[in-house]
Amino acid sequence: MAGRRSSNVCPFPGNSGGGLEGPVPMRVDTPTWLSSQAATSRLMVRPGMGPGFCPGPEVWGVPLGPSPYEFRGGIAPYGAYETRTWSQNSSEDTYPGPYIALRYMPNLALPEDVSAIQKEMEQLAKELRQKRMTLGYSQADVGFAVGAMFGKVLSQTTICRFEAQQLSLANMWKLRPLLKMWLEEVDEKNLLGICRMEMILQQARKRRRASRERRIGSNLEKLFLQCPEPTPQQISYIAGRLRLQKDLVQVWFSNRSQMAGWPTNDSSQRENVGATGAPFPGPPVCFPLAPGLHFDFPHYGGSCLTPLYSSTPFPVRGALLSAPTTTLGLPRLSS
């Protein structure tokens, strides 16, 4: 297989880059790792995007797809190339997907007129916040949409600090091109950009919801293996930690018990477990967990989750229940 090389971006002859008032045509040399079907293509880049954003010769990405990805800065053709996952070491996340790697020009220093730049950043921060709230988007939505459209995902914290003008002027200047392009995309006159934004966010929400459901299901399965018949207090605690309704957790354990072949005709006895006390003598125990993990119930005045290997075994209908050797952890879910 041929070795990989970085793609080169250079302006067409005759374009000096100074004083231009529109998209600048750029030539993108096809890297060796692209398909042979891909010929040298053209990418329209707005003046100042490369020099004004990258702190140096850094590699950024343009999402691949079945049709040309159009935005108000121009057209980035793609679709006939091999997919290649691109990533970089940065404090920000990278949009998960294949990219055409592009190398932008080195960064330009801040203009000498700092006061004018500061006023521009203040105006941009206000405009960003106003547009985002008008459209009903969260700060995380804006950051993800920027990554989906332009190849660089910005975190919710970054958008929040930009709107509050808590970033340094240099960092705000670096984010300026991407955020201005996003504002142009969601302009009320650009219906195509707004529709594309909605599609991107819908797909993102579906992925986040599916990921959250997988984490919850995996955690509930671990809990079931350790305690197939939790008490009402345990169910309430699980629901609180997983941010679920108590009825959903109770139904899940009931259905899982039926799948595992556990008897379910003694529901009345199961409902009275909390009133009659723990199923075995000793202090109140919610779940047998691996050593080192303890959760506290505020109403019990101490640790309610004890290590598995205690002096009192955990009986389940006359049989001892073994527990996995790994430490059980509850996922941290984001709203």
Swiss-Prot record:
Single GO term (MF): RNA polymerase II cis-regulatory region sequence-specific DNA binding
BP GO annotations: cell differentiation; meiotic cell cycle; regulation of transcription by RNA polymerase II; spermatogenesis
UniProt keyword annotation of Cell membrane present: no
PANTHER family per UniProt: POU DOMAIN (PTHR11636), POU DOMAIN, CLASS 5, TRANSCRIPTION FACTOR 2 (PTHR11636:SF14)
CDD domains: homeodomain (cd00086)
DNA-binding region: 205-264
Name recorded for this polypeptide: POU domain, class 5, transcription factor 2
Pfam families assigned to the protein according to its UniProt record, in alphabetical order: Homeodomain, Pou
UniProt cross-references to SUPFAM superfamilies, sorted A to Z: Homeodomain-like (SSF46689), lambda repressor-like DNA-binding domains (SSF47413)
Gene that this sequence comes from: Pou5f2
Described purpose of this protein according to its UniProt entry: Transcription factor that binds preferentially to the octamer motif (5'-ATGTTAAT-3'). May exert a regulatory function in meiotic events that are required for terminal differentiation of male germ cell.
Positions of the UniProt region annotated as Disordered: 1-23
Tissue specificity annotation: Highly restricted to adult testis.
Domain (POU-specific) ranges: 113-187
Record InterPro entries: HD, Homeodomain-like_sf, Lambda_DNA-bd_dom_sf, POU, POU_dom, POU_domain_TF
